[in-house]
Amino acid sequence: LFIAHDLAVVRHFSQRVAVMYLGKIIEIGDRASIYTRPRHPYTHALLSAVPEVSVAGESAGPRERIRLAGDVPSPISPPSGCRFRTRCWKAQDRCAAEEPPLIRVSGNREGHLTACHFPEDPTTEARAEDIVLDPALAALEEGGH
């Protein structure tokens, strides 16, 4: 178990990733699926803050940063329904009325679950070459020692 707020670091240490908001898991899946096809708006916002670097080590260009409006609600007294709804640009009445279950959304890979009534469309196709691993971690994943 590796807990961090820095998704740029999490990418290099984890095979499965769970994204939490106010103490609840709102998205969980394998690393490639979360980083290349995030479905929860909060996951999109978090990933928009991760700097992009090209293979040559130069900036890959500007990424549209999602800035969340409003204050973070109290975890002691979270809002009704979806805990992220007070800061979500997709929130509707249903989000306040019922908490979204953590389910597999159409288009997600097996094991990629999202808790959102109005999930984001996948923004990219999952490609293994998009994930650059530390060589030691890559060797472990390939069965090396």
What residue spans do the PLM features occupy?
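Short, glycine/charged-rich "phosphate-handling" switch motifs in NTP-dependent
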Residues: 16, 28
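Charged, flexible cofactor/metal-binding loops and thiol motifs
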Residues: 30-144
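A short, surface-exposed alpha-helical micro-motif characterized by mixed small hydrophobic
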Residues: 10-12
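H-loop/switch region of ABC-family ATPase nucleotide-binding domains
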Residues: 4-5
